[in-house]
Amino acid sequence: MKRLLKIGVLGAGHLGKIHLRCILQADQVYALAGFYDPNPDTSRETALQFNIRAFPSAEALIEAVDVVDIVTPTPSHFALAEKAILAGKHVFVEKPLTRTLEEAQQLIQLSRAHRVQVQVGHVERFNPALLALKGQDLNPMFIEAHRLASFNPRGADVSVVLDLMIHDLDIV
């Protein structure tokens, strides 16, 4: 029988809950070990909602898993990813990877030194509208992007470039 990768999620906010749902549905690939969220109320509610283990700390979760899924505010990405990599764990980080290029380069160097994978969640790559363009013979000379959505303050910990425009830049 194939051994499933044990994965743990750091962060149980809006996106963290989406990640938890997706991991639970991918039960042929992953065994969800649980999650950690620093907010005790969020932690308690999420554990009950998903019937999963709430770890007492990020460190306890990192120690218990093969893969760490980081779905926390961007300013915490670097420190959490660094801890996971130094512990020899593979890391999936919701975009953006870090706040700065220097931090991202440090994580890349660390991941190579510790022989672990680091992946960034650029979900727009899997948008059906974008996938429909595959195979088309396109030679764009100018690209203009518009986001038609109301402002959501939950992503205000980083600039609009790192929060939203990063998808457009990734696609280009």
Describe the predicted segments one by one:
Residues 1-49, 172:
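N-terminal Rossmann-like dinucleotide-binding module
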Residues 19, 50-108:
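Beta-loop-alpha module in the N-terminal Rossmann-like domain of NAD(P)-dependent dehydrogenases
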Residues 22, 26, 46-49, 83-87, ...:
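Alpha-helical structural signal in soluble globular domains
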Residues 30, 89, 116-117:
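Short, well-ordered coil/turn segments that N-cap beta-strands
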Residues 33, 66, 141:
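Conserved acidic residues
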Residues 98-155, 168:
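A contiguous active-site-proximal alpha/beta segment in oxidoreductase catalytic domains
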Residues 155-162:
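Glycine-rich "substrate-gating" loop/helix at the edge of Rossmann-like oxidoreductase active sites
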